Amino acid sequence: MEKMSQVILLFFIYSFIGWLWETVYCSLKAKKFVYRGFLVGPYCPIYGFGVLSVLYFVEPFENNLLVLYVGSAVLVTILEYVTSYGLEKLFHASWWDYHDVPFNLNGRVALPVSLFWGLGCVLIVKVIQPEIAKVVSFLQATFGNYLALCIVIVMGLDLIYTLLNMQGFKKLITEMGQTLETNQQEFKQRLNTKMEIATADWQKLKERTKKEHFQNRLNFQQRRFINNYPKLTLKNIKNSKEVRHLLEDLKNKGQ
């Protein structure tokens, strides 16, 4: 049980550090506060899983810097690709996109990013982990296994809430796509008129769709996803670009 408690504490600490890194980096880049993370709480589990994978599979080779670097980069890249693929299949959405980064693979991973992760993992193993290990030992000595148990409960409830919330989001964007598809049929019947009139009619149809079907449908967590993930791409959704624009409009107007 003590070993499991150690793993849970390490997972939480590195998940928090990952969330802190992403939040600070993205906030500076966007010049505004950006609350990152798939879950509600201040942690990004992908970082926890990534660092734990490195610590338990690659750290034994820490004296061989090349193996440590390459092994870390490969492990984290595989995890990033699998996570991206899984989220897309589950929720019909892509949370990050590396298509504009050189040497990318399906926009899910990219060589420059992987090389950066490799450097980060070397820094963690050589410099950060020895200090984190001291913190974990202190926490275990102070709180026993209770802190780890609380972390599991809180993150578990957070995960359940987020999954339910994302299922609602998936249902909403699917409904949006289908509704816009229906409205397009009405729009096509007007193409024999002047283009500017048809365009104006299409804008009215979209506005009517927004007001009649989708106002007040986005909750706080869903607005956060749209606001803090500008590269969020909808997959396998009818009229995905129009749905994305509609989501932005609803979010900006607080509806």
Model region roles, listed by residue range:
Residues 1-255:
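Aromatic-rich, lipid-facing transmembrane alpha helices and their immediate juxtamembrane interface loops
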